[in-house]
């Protein structure tokens, strides 16, 4: 748990990551339910710029690659999981939604972090399935992930300060929430 007094004392009154040169270009997820993949790849891109000196204007990781392998297993060189399947078919992965847990688990297995040029995200039509061997074709690998669970009763100011502190400490956060369709319209 983050100490609120400490968090408030280390958070500047104003911060703009664009001025620091950390933010890559804004991307459009189109009509697909891949916001979770965009959030995670964006956080990876910011980390790459901030921590390993990547250039914000030139880094572009594939949201499609992460989303695809979030629902489809890649090739397992040890042959422990090559016959594993998900209940979601390959053509459902962009419409099914997801969350940070799904994405981080895939990234911990070195799936994702691939180059956008190799696996472009298409907003006009559902793209073809990827080869299983493409799962580990990564440009960047996840080293660490930090998770903070906010309970419903979490004080709003505390939650805001925790997120601000994490942005200052790690450069970016990826955020997931559940939106039930019955609350739309």
Please annotate each region the language model reported.
Residues 22-32, 89-93:
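A short glycine/serine-rich beta->alpha loop
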Residues 9-13, 60, 169:
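A short, polar/charged loop/turn motif at coil->beta-strand junctions and beta-hairpin connectors
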Residues 48-64:
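Short, well-structured active-site flanking segments
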Residues 1-16:
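N-terminal zymogen propeptides
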Residues 23-26, 49, 163, 173:
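Hydrophobic aliphatic residue packing
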Residues 29-53:
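Alpha-helical support elements that line or immediately flank enzyme active sites
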Residues 16-17, 36-45, 65-185:
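Predominantly the structural core of cysteine protease catalytic domains
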Residues 13-25:
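Short, conserved catalytic-motif segment at the N-terminal edge
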């Amino acid at each position: 748990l983050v100490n609120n007094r400490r968090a408030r004392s280390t958070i500047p009154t104003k911060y703009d990551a664009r001025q620091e040169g950390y933010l890559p270009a804004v991307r459009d997820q189109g009509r697909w339910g891949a916001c979770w993949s965009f959030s995670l790849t964006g956080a990876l891109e910011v980390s790459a710029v901030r921590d390993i000196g990547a250039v914000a204007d030139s880094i572009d990781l594939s949201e499609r690659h992460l989303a695809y392998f979030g629902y489809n297993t890649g090739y397992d060189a040890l042959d422990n999981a090559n016959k594993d399947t998900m209940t979601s078919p390959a053509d459902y992965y962009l419409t099914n939604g997801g969350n940070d847990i799904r994405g981080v688990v895939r990234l911990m297995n070195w799936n994702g972090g691939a180059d956008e040029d190799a696996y472009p995200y298409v907003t006009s039509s559902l793209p073809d399935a990827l080869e299983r061997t493409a799962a580990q074709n990564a440009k960047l690998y996840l080293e660490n992930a930090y998770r903070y669970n906010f309970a419903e009763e979490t004080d709003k100011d505390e939650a805001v300060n925790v997120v601000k502190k994490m942005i200052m400490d790690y450069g970016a956060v990826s955020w997931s929430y559940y939106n039930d369709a019955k609350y739309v319209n």
